[in-house]
């Protein structure tokens, strides 16, 4: 296969879900990303492999599921890639691309392991990232290059000195949350961070145009998982794993914009990018390339289902799911409340309001009709279960079990998993104290000391 030698600008955010105007949120101000979506390929059924930061990002950058690459929990709790796992920057560096990272990464406490030629992860607030990334783009190395710009936004918190909140009156509260003043205000603050980060992306896009690099650069925008709200982040519902993903081809390809409505998994990003760049896809990659569909507008689906997983967040909470265009089937492997809220959500206004409402025991199995019930509010495997629902669930369960076997997905016992989670969490708290450092954009506060590559 002949490499195309195009550049790649990859921009990723925290905790956004699909909260952009381009995804049907008119109450969100995101004009630059909406424009990017109109100019490129807007993915409407992209799903993270996991509803939390490190496992999701691990799949996006390796093309492998968390149980395969080893990143089944949060990097700042001590989880790391398995030895020998190669990332997108590793692969592109070996193929002749110059690779650089500015800002957020949440895959490791040792960023030099990620395979970039140069990196500065010391500060991941969007203005710092964009200042350094635009300077880098003004005098880039000899192409081709991969430039990754990682924003801390839109992770909690949303301090007003950084983000001017939207008008709470205009906020549309999602169906899975009660419509209260505190929740509206919380969403308004979230929207404020979106607007600031959107403008920062605009500066990157403007720099590409001003330098002429937009003619030869693939622009990829993505987030890791759903927003930090109850029944979104840290769950395997659509609001938890559904992600914004936009790909704009180089201007010189004259590729027509499109809305891509096929199912797309986080593990598919790496093989799709390699294919678009004309590079061979390594044999250990578990994702599928969608490049042919994106370039030729073919309508043959690449995949008919996506698989999602959660094992460790701030606690041991093992869940697996399979999702088609018509149904979502979830298996819960431990006795837990309806929602096991991670720290950042539990301490938020929506978390405090919702916590008393989600203490009932979670069912072992869940099935949702995504055509009739897109917000996944009525479990078809409840007391009113029908023969049809049971049959559909059984078929999906077989596919899920087959996928777990193929990916060597071993779920620890309740005793072992809980002890493992406690060990990682206790070590994290012993090192960092009660301050939750994952909510900081400053790498040194997150336990990452070697935050610059030599020369940065």
Which residue ranges define each predicted feature?
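Small-residue-rich loop/turn and linker elements
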Residues: 416-421
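Extracellular, beta-strand-rich glycan-interacting domains
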Residues: 370-372
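Formylglycine-dependent sulfatase
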Residues: 1-359, 365, 374-398, 402, ...
